[in-house]
Amino acid sequence: MVAPMKGQVCVVTGASRGIGRGIALQLCKAGATVYITGRHLDTLRATAQEAQSLGGRCVPVVCDSSQESEVKSLFEQVDREQKGRLDVLVNNAYAGVQAILNTTNKSFWEVPASIWDDINNVGLRGHYLCSVYGARLMVPAGKGLIVIVSSPGGLQHMFNVPYGVGKAACDRLAADCAHELRRHGVSYVSLWPGLVQTEMVKEFMAKEDTPEDPLFKKMKPDFSSAESPEMSGKCVVALATDPNILNLSGKVLPSCDLARRYGLKDIDGRPVKDYFSLGYALSQVSSLGWLNSFLPGFLRVPKWVVTLYNSKF
């Protein structure tokens, strides 16, 4: 089996389950040594065992990304054990999913203000902490890739206010860090997965009391064709092995765009749903949905249209 990342060292935060787990599995399958973090050693060990069965090496490390001392200790361990080498950092840890699911039909003033910290202490501040300590290993080597897992929630309202603000900040974090890292040969990108069939979302969709929930109604039409968590992993492997990755640094990279760029399909062979196709865009407008079946898949909404539509000026 080809191992394009053999010898490379990676860190994936929040890899006990969901997207982080999927990324860790694919990085190990590509032959890398992968440090995975989470707050519970038992689930980390389960992920590590499965990942190592695919190839590579997986090292579970208990680390709360909201605690700088624990983040610092994580990267000191990588530095010590890998002689200063770090090739890929994936900022994925996120502690806000349950808070989002519990408040889907409420406005920001109707929920405790502490939801801001529930969502963004790990999902934004934690990413910055990891970026700081990860960059300190990458910059001296003159190479490396940092990926932050974000979403279109940074463009327009999705779920709630703290979520959208946090995701917009993640995209800006990638852009500004990329600006400062470029001269050192280190890339930083923002990855936008599509709708993903994570364990927690599957549980939410399976509950008997959710059919009338507005979030359930929003996700139901696309959930059966949603991406597997490992699709994000395939995207990260493709980026990490791209010799021209610096050309993409600072950019927002939707998984459907990366699937087209690198010829990727999901782990079960399914094509990745293209949320930027013209057909999909029209399907979201009730009076125009019928046009979808007549449009070829290669017709896409230009990025400048997306930018203009979401412009704040």
Swiss-Prot record:
It catalyses: 17alpha-estradiol + NADP(+) = estrone + NADPH + H(+); testosterone + NADP(+) = androst-4-ene-3,17-dione + NADPH + H(+); prostaglandin E1 + NADPH + H(+) = prostaglandin F1 + NADP(+); isatin + NADPH + H(+) = 3-hydroxyindolin-2-one + NADP(+). Its EC number is 1.1.1.-. Substrate binds at S151. It is found in: Endoplasmic reticulum. GO terms for molecular function: carbonyl reductase (NADPH) activity; estradiol 17-alpha-dehydrogenase [NAD(P)+] activity; oxidoreductase activity, acting on the CH-OH group of donors, NAD or NADP as acceptor; testosterone 17-beta-dehydrogenase (NADP+) activity. NAD(+) binds at I19, D64, Y163, K167, T198. Pfam families: adh_short. InterPro entries: NAD(P)-bd_dom_sf, SDR_fam. GO terms for cellular component: endoplasmic reticulum; mitochondrial inner membrane; mitochondrion. The active site is at Y163 (proton acceptor). Keywords: Endoplasmic reticulum, Methylation, NAD, Oxidoreductase. The modification Omega-N-methylarginine is found at R21. It comes from the Eukaryota. NADPH-dependent oxidoreductase which catalyzes the reduction of some steroids (estrone, androstene-3,17-dione and cortisone) as well as prostaglandin E1, isatin and xenobiotics in vitro. May have a role in steroid and/or xenobiotic metabolism. May be attached to the ER membrane by its C-terminus segment. Belongs to the short-chain dehydrogenases/reductases (SDR) family. This is Dehydrogenase/reductase SDR family member 1.
